Swiss-Prot record:
It comes from Brucella canis (strain ATCC 23365 / NCTC 10854 / RM-666). The lineage of its organism: Bacteria, Pseudomonadati, Pseudomonadota, Alphaproteobacteria, Hyphomicrobiales. NCBIfam families: PRK05327.1, rpsD_bact. One of its GO terms (molecular function) is rRNA binding. This is Small ribosomal subunit protein uS4. GO terms for biological process: ribosomal small subunit biogenesis; translation. InterPro entries: Ribosomal_uS4, Ribosomal_uS4_bac-type, Ribosomal_uS4_CS, Ribosomal_uS4_N, S4_RNA-bd, S4_RNA-bd_sf. Transmembrane segments: none annotated. Part of the 30S ribosomal subunit. Contacts protein S5. The interaction surface between S4 and S5 is involved in control of translational fidelity. Residues 19-45 are annotated as: Disordered. The gene is rpsD.
């Protein structure tokens, strides 16, 4: 495993879960966290610890986004009508990097962030290089013409380990995806259990 891959799996090791469902994740082979003290037996988590872990897991899944950005997303979810946890999932899944990853244009969420930063993605015909760009229902995301033959794109399309969720329509021949609707928790194909209700409890303390 390269240093780059190892860094990406640090989140898996820290949480002790294979949060992206990747076959190469080191937690498939061991049940302890990173570092020399990782093998120590972990005690039962407090309520705060359980809530914190739920937050870390959700943050980690979307590329370990910053606390400032994650809290801002939570606060927006809390201001909206309806269930705050469901709103939070909908907002996270409407991020451009999440949709590029879900559409299988790239193999990982980290690759999606870099891919967008490097200017390989259009939204509604215009180049967007902001990872956290919020998509609206009906928005069309496309890999730019000059980028469609990049090895990382061709590799990602062939990945069998995950499917494109039904709230995104994808044409892999044209490398175009349409964001059809805002998903709820039950719609999102997470590889592990996500508990946004515990994230709400964490921020409501």
């Amino acid at each position: 495993m390269s240093k780059r891959e190892s860094a990406k799996y640090k989140i898996d090791r820290r949480l002790g879960e294979n949060i992206w469902g990747r076959p190469k994740s080191p937690v498939n082979r061991r049940e302890y966290g990173p570092g020399q003290h990782g093998q120590r037996r972990k005690g039962k988590l407090s309520d705060f610890g359980v809530q914190l872990r739920a937050k870390q897991k959700l943050k980690g899944f979307y590329g370990d986004i910053s606390e400032k950005q994650f809290r801002k997303t939570y606060e927006e979810a809390a201001r909206r009508k309806g269930d705050t946890g469901e709103n939070l999932i909908g907002l996270l899944e409407s991020r451009l990097d999440a949709v590029v990853y879900r559409a299988k244009f790239v193999p990982t969420i980290f690759a999606a962030r870099q891919f967008i930063n490097h200017g390989h993605v259009n939204v509604n015909g215009r180049r967007v290089n902001i990872q956290s760009y919020r998509l609206k229902v009906g928005d069309v995301v496309e890999v730019r013409e000059k980028s469609k033959q990049l090895a990382i794109v061709l590799e990602a399309v062939q990945l069998a380990e995950r499917d494109v969720p039904d709230y995104i329509d994808v044409d892999h021949n044209k490398m175009v995806a349409t964001y059809n609707r805002v998903p709820g928790l039950s719609d999102v194909p997470y590889a592990v259990q996500m508990e946004p209700n515990l994230v709400v409890e964490f921020y409501s303390r």
